[in-house]
Amino acid sequence: AKEQAQIMGREYITVVCMEGPEYYTLQGVAKVGKGSCEISGDNFMMLDLPGGKQGVALSDGMGSGERACRESTLVIELLEELLEAGFPEKMAIQMINTTLVMGREEIHYSTIDMCVFDLYSGIGEFLKAGASSTFIKKKDTIEHLRSTSLPIGVVHKLDVDHAKRQLEDGDFVIMVTDGIMDALPVGEQDVLLETIIKGTAIINPKEMAEHILKQVLN
């Protein structure tokens, strides 16, 4: 026994057992520049967060092309850094807004559309600042989550739209920027996009994103 103790060593080892998440997510992205512009003004992030959560965010910079791309890239990079540092999602968005408002003489706004998935409970937390509608496709229904708040970078005190929804296996969360909405007739965007989403049985997220983009552009 003494020889075995010498072989095994005398140092203590801590083993932590954690329950695995109940859910996992699959993502798909499709984007194109506005008009003849090859550069899209939209940017996105997908980030693993502490506590078995995943964050997905879109940002649409003011205007189009390279300038809009720089704006949305800045927003996404700041958001990612703040979330990785442990700031709550809503506070992180408000901090970015303050930075953009106070640090510039001219107004350069960007939208933020964010969803945080709890992989243990299946709850999706949605935060929007000037963003387009989000569509939640379930087995038999499609729900629209709309934003009434301003984009970030416009006013000092920003109200962030906030909602929570229970998600189930097989649900789709479809997030779009205003480039998709602007390509559809005014006043009919949500209805037409819902029709496009409802009219397909695609289950692959990447194929779904490409299908929506193709249908809207056609």
Question: Can you say where each PLM-predicted feature lies in the sequence?
Answer:
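Catalytic core of PPM/PP2C metal-dependent serine/threonine phosphatase domains
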Residues: 2, 6-12, 69-139, 213-218
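N-terminal entry segment of metal-dependent catalytic domains or homologous docking segments
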Residues: 8-61, 67, 74, 133, ...
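Short, glycine-/Ser/Thr-/acidic-enriched flexible segments
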Residues: 32-34, 51, 62-63, 119, ...
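Acidic loop->beta-strand submotif enriched in PP2C/PPM serine/threonine phosphatases
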Residues: 37-50, 145-185
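Non-catalytic regulatory/linker segments of enzymes
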Residues: 50-51, 105, 116, 163
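Short hydrophobic-aromatic micro-motifs
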Residues: 54-57, 126, 173-176
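Active-site-proximal, acidic helix/loop segment immediately C-terminal to a metal-coordinating Asp/Glu
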Residues: 63-85, 167, 171-217
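PP2C/PPM-type serine/threonine phosphatase catalytic core
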Residues: 125-154, 161-163, 190, 194, ...
